[in-house]
């Protein structure tokens, strides 16, 4: 668990759902500084690389942007190899003194694979095609898992999971951004 520092910008919820030939990453737009909402429409889910990878990040905002930039550099080194780029980033994350102190996590996906890159330098694949991170991640994960076996689409599941998380988590709002890709 990340220790809360009231002078650090925290909070968000990111969820990913892979179902029926689609992969979706959704995130909210709230940025909090301590117990104050600083911004309600931040964009924490975006396309990276050549537009064939989607990423969502949670944690300390500056740290998350640093990791996002590092992942983009790895994707330039290893184009169309998200798994390899992520593993190489994780190696750097574990060995670089500066990167080891970063307090952020990312969910990334391309047409083939969905991964979580954790603050400890781990690269994890989701079970059941669903994964969530951030302050409301457990709520979004539970909601998405409950809905994955229904006839709802990946995007519908992600949006519903995000709305449930936003109803419960004070660091998550209802300004939801969704990015999707066709999946194999």
Curated annotation (Swiss-Prot):
Main subcellular location of this protein, as a coarse class: cytoplasm
Catalysed reaction, written as an equation: ATP-dependent cleavage of peptide bonds with broad specificity
EC number in record: 3.4.25.2
Active site: 12
A cellular component term, taken from the record's GO annotations: HslUV protease complex
UniProt subcellular location: Cytoplasm
Description of how activity is regulated: Allosterically activated by HslU binding.
GO molecular function, a single term: metal ion binding
Subunit structure: A double ring-shaped homohexamer of HslV is capped on each side by a ring-shaped HslU homohexamer. The assembly of the HslU/HslV complex is dependent on binding of ATP.
Full protein name: ATP-dependent protease subunit HslV
């Amino acid at each position: 668990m990340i220790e809360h520092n009231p002078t650090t910008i925290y909070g968000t919820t990111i969820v990913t759902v892979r179902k029926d030939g689609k992969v979706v990453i959704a995130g909210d737009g709230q940025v909090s500084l301590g117990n104050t909402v600083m911004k309600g429409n931040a964009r924490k889910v975006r396309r990276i690389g050549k537009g064939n990878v989607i990423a969502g990040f949670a944690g300390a905002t500056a740290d998350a942007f640093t990791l996002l930039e590092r992942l983009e550099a790895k994707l330039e080194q290893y184009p169309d190899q998200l798994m390899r780029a992520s593993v190489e980033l994780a190696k750097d994350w574990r060995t670089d003194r500066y990167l080891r102190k970063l307090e952020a996590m990312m969910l990334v996906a391309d047409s083939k694979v969905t991964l979580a890159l954790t603050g400890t330098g781990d690269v994890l694949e989701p079970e059941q095609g669903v994964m969530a991170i951030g302050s409301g991640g457990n709520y979004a994960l539970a909601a998405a898992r409950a809905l994955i076996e229904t006839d709802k689409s990946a995007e519908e599941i992600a949006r519903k999971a995000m709305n449930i998380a936003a109803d419960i988590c004070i660091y998550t709002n209802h300004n939801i951004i969704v990015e999707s890709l066709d999946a194999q």
